[in-house]
């Protein structure tokens, strides 16, 4: 595989293998349930698509889009505000929801989304993330399925971006940016 940018932290082959494993586990856990797969755009789009194909049971699919305002900078300490800008189109009342995220860093976005989805009265809500940065967690959130735990590095590729670029990389690469805003 040709390297387009950066130093890979997770290769395309490693991601494919892990997503197959997650798909098998989710298939087992959700068999016989009224199941809705909810992706968080834009970052989770690549992971979401590959994971959906790896899940071998009938499901509904839907998406949310969120916007973070006032992202916390390392220097300012200003807390960010999470806002849902595109709502679900599926009615999730009484259904089992699996929220698909690209990365869980502080936990703020996931916490906000789980609370928002809970107001729609689903039967259950679980969280699956491609990447987890446990060292950055400031909010204790339940993550039911984790693709990879990674160190506190800014990563791009496979849906994750820097200024809307690099989402198309087929692997995850470290981007070295001193003093940049939080990733989540």
Regions found by a protein language model. Name each.
Residues 1-184:
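PRPP-associated nucleotide enzymes
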